[in-house]
């Protein structure tokens, strides 16, 4: 395996091509196709999709019925077949072809000097500007037969003319796992039950649409809606290309739109109304698509119901060997640094609005269901407890209850800083909650002495026991206060901490009566608090404190810092949340292999100047990570993720927030508490052998 090879990492490079059309000049069009095919080959493309009827031109009307044109189309196709002999890509081009005494609007699949299959258009539009039934016929639904193609290359064994499948087919690469291509043509995408749907249910992971599609105002957005929808519903990649410059403008105009979607996400879109040939390239994640279908068992159920055991309904399969380059070709797709945080400002604002209100709605329902008790919460002046408190405040407002029913406690320990304690105090004061400070140091010192810990005898020993005595006492106080005052303890820990087991089990911050933050990753938490400030959920005084908290080092504040040293840092211990949330998303939502996560992380994080950052992200925090750093922290993530499952197995109730998933043992993530992650670490180490120490 080559760690830096996109093909070895489960991707395939695909392209949508639009080119200058020469109406009724097949050899000129073939030349354009061959020229772009050579460029696709040079760029390591596995599948290249061209527009509908690109060999002849689409808008040539009754010339489509002229034998002179059709004879020339076949000869031009023969020249494309011949030129493809030494080229990598599977080429899918559009042409009018005779079948018996009829004419079909076809896609022709060509690879390495052979015609692999011919796919006729299933649905012919005959309304508004379209009159395709004047020229073409359709084939019986799902029918597939074999026809002789004299121009289709040479049969490998007989040396005679080629007989190829004619109808619905699946084109599968035997050396690129998961690359199975299904083809439909233009109008096929616009009908209620599309050929693409049938092809996806039969196993196609990559769907190609050869389109002509003249442009009118708004049609570009309509196309994109359809492509996105099909790719999302079918858990597939979708390659779309439309006819462009050169098509007849007698009554219509053409924009040459190209786009590539994957499972509802846009990977690439081409500029419209361009002169000359235009190639839109993206690397589709085949492993992601296969994993998504495995996870969504209803996809397989739907396929079984649709085909119902009748093999005659299934497309014919054609197998090819691509032999793609296993070298570093880069990666032709954007990889989000923060997969839980969208870069688009409008989408980020919407996500924050929904996340915040999901948390509030979950807490409101729980309070109503159990008789509207008071809320007991420990407020440290850190991100998580701060956000839990603002969620609780909003919940009380919706319930029509006074915020004084939120009983806030700050519980300073041996390393609590003046800044965090001040912020906690001011936040509670400005929100109008009940507030009390309980110094846990005397009780912690006594407990350490009682158990014979060196600190109890005056020795500066700051080990895990020293830390957990403080964490445990805080939780113990909160639960006893809840008992005493008729409340519930509101948990504050977040999704990232749960993944890493960065919490104290049982009598510690792992436990609460209800936990509002367990579905929120740390990297989103900061944006949520910014959104709370920007959207004026509370007054300006609260906003100022929230901004101060945002600029505070993330720390458990359990170990005192020596004079001149920096305070205890969570990220120094368990890794940057930037990287750990990246890994968490790809484990939880994508089911990706560790080596692939490292590959993607390097693409996302190796250069801070490349790619986009979420709106409002501080300039000073825009950092980069080397592959060595990425692998170091991913190893730690894997070790902690497996070894700390026992904490998640006893997770309190709390709402799922992110589509990226949750770690609730009753929901998205079910895993034994006593398994080892050694094989996952070994897979990572084997892949990066020789690249990092």
Q: How would you name each of these model-derived features?
A:
Residues 1-378, 394-403, 435:
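Enzyme catalytic cores with a strong preference for nitrogen-chemistry domains
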């Amino acid at each position: 395996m080559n760690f830096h090879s996109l093909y070895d990492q489960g991707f395939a490079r695909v392209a949508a091509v639009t080119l200058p059309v020469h109406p009724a000049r097949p050899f000129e069009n073939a030349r354009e196709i061959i020229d772009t095919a050579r460029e696709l080959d040079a760029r390591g493309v596995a599948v290249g999709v061209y527009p509908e009827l690109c060999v002849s031109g689409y808008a040539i009307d009754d010339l489509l019925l002229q034998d002179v044109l059709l004879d020339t189309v076949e000869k031009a196709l023969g020249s494309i077949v011949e030129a493809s002999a030494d080229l990598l890509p599977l080429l899918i081009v559009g042409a009018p072809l005779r079948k018996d005494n009829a004419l079909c609007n076809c896609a022709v699949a060509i690879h390495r000097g052979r015609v692999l299959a011919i796919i006729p258009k299933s649905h012919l539009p005959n309304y508004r500007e379209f009159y395709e039934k004047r020229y073409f016929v359709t084939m019986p639904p799902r029918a597939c037969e074999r026809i002789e193609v004299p121009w289709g290359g040479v049969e490998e064994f007989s040396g005679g003319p080629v007989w190829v499948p004619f109808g619905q087919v699946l084109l599968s690469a035997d050396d690129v796992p998961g690359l199975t291509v299904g083809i439909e043509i233009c109008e096929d995408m616009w009908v209620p039950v599309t050929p693409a749907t049938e092809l996806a249910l039969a196993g196609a992971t990559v769907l190609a649409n050869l389109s002509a599609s003249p442009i009118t105002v708004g049609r570009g957005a309509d196309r994109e809606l359809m492509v996105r929808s099909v790719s999302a519903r079918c858990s597939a990649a979708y390659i779309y290309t439309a006819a462009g410059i050169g098509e007849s403008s007698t009554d219509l105009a053409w924009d040459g739109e190209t786009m590539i979607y994957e499972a509802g996400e846009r990977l690439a879109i081409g500029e419209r109304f361009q002169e000359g040939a235009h190639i839109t390239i993206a690397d589709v994640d085949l492993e992601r698509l296969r994993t998504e279908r495995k996870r969504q068992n209803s996809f397989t159920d739907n396929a079984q119901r649709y085909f119902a055991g009748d093999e005659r309904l299934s497309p014919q399969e054609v197998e090819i060997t691509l032999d793609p380059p296993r070298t570093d070709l880069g990666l032709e797709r954007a990889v989000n640094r923060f997969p839980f945080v969208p870069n688009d400002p409008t989408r980020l604002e919407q996500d924050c609005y929904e996340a915040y209100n999901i948390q509030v709605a979950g807490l409101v329902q729980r309070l109503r269901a159990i008789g509207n008790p008071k809320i007991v919460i420990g407020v440290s002046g850190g991100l998580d407890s701060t956000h839990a408190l603002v969620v609780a405040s909003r919940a009380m407002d919706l319930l029509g209850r006074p915020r004084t029913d939120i009983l806030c406690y700050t519980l300073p320990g041996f390393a609590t800083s003046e800044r965090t304690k001040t912020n906690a105090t001011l936040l509670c004061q400005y929100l109008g909650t009940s507030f009390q400070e309980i110094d846990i140091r005397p009780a912690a010192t006594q407990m350490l002495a009682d158990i014979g810990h060196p600190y109890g005898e005056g020795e500066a020993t700051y080990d895990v026991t020293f830390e957990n005595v403080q964490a445990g006492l805080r939780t113990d106080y909160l639960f006893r206060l809840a008992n005493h005052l008729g409340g519930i303890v509101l948990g504050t820990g977040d999704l990232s901490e749960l993944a890493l087991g960065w919490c104290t089990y049982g009598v510690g911050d792992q436990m609460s009566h209800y936990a509002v933050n367990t579905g929120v990753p740390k990297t989103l938490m900061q944006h949520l608090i910014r959104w709370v400030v920007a959207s004026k959920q509370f007054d300006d005084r609260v906003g100022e404190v929230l901004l101060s908290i945002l600029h505070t080092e993330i720390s458990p504040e359990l170990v005192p810092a020596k004079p001149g040293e920096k305070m205890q840092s969570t990220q120094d211990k368990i890794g940057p949340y930037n990287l750990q949330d990246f890994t968490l998303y790809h484990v939880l939502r994508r089911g990706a292999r560790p080596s692939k996560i490292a590959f993607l992380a390097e693409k996302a994080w190796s250069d801070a100047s490349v790619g986009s950052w979420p709106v409002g992200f501080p300039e000073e925090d825009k950092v980069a990570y080397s592959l060595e750093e990425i692998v170091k922290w991913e190893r730690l993530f894997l070790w902690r993720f497996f070894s700390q499952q026992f904490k998640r197995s006893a997770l309190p109730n709390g709402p799922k927030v992110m589509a990226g998933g949750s770690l609730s043992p009753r929901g998205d993530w079910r895993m034994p508490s006593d398994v080892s992650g050694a094989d996952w670490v070994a897979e990572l180490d084997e892949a990066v052998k020789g690249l990092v120490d």
